[in-house]
Amino acid sequence: MRFQAGLTYFLKKLYPDTFQIPDMQYRSNMLQERGAYRFAAFTRLFFWTEPGYETGVMPDGMIYYGDAQWYVNKKKAYSFAAKGGHNDEPHNHNDLGSFIIATDAGQCLADIGSGEYTRDYFREKRYTYLCNASAGHSVPLIDGQEQLAGRERAAKVLEHGEHVFEISFEKGYGIEALTALRRRFELAEDSVSMRDSYQFDDGNTHQITERFIALIEPQETAAGVLVGDVLLVCKEKPAVNKIIIKDHNAEDLAVYQIDYAAGTEFEIQFQIRG
């Protein structure tokens, strides 16, 4: 993921004491990297870029954006981001509870991003595109069902702090028997631990698939599944599936779904090995 220089310099003007401009090697080249060319983005680049500013490194630390329910935490070894929110956002993805873990190797637990813009992409078939559907995010499938779209499909943040982020997001699923679904992240300097807890009120056994998305090819080892610099350690046996989709530039993109069959309590640790 590269930054847009024009918008970045504009933010530097607004927040001169706290906002850092990344090194120019990470700058986006709009003409080479973007499949949808926008006049507004070009004008921002042309009028707002002021190369006189010094580049720097964002300090380590946690930021929580309450209105959007976005949690971002930068450590020395990795960066972590997770979201609550709702499933009726602009350019919406059905992604309550999804998260990213990034290292110098890139996004190890990844967000696919936007797909190829077609007519159906913005119509009723929007959520048949993997990048927009919850099946293309690091969130569970319950009885084979994905999250649904809509403003009522919303999460609730239960706790956020320097080392923890916890949400409930059972409303994301149209499953009447699902009365509670909590996802809790605990962050250390070299690992992220995640625990999901489910409650159902019908007394039945439900099929739960915990899914994690990668764009780096996973390697199955004796210790766990290695994705870039991140080792997924879980007592359950993984199943890895590769799917080819069209990315925003209409080019083939390999997406890896790492699935675990789970019960009503599920724990996994993401160990940073870089």
Residue map of PLM features:
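Carbohydrate-active enzyme catalytic cores, enriched for enzymes
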Residues: 1-108
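Residue-level structural signal for beta-strand termini and adjacent loop
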Residues: 85, 113-114
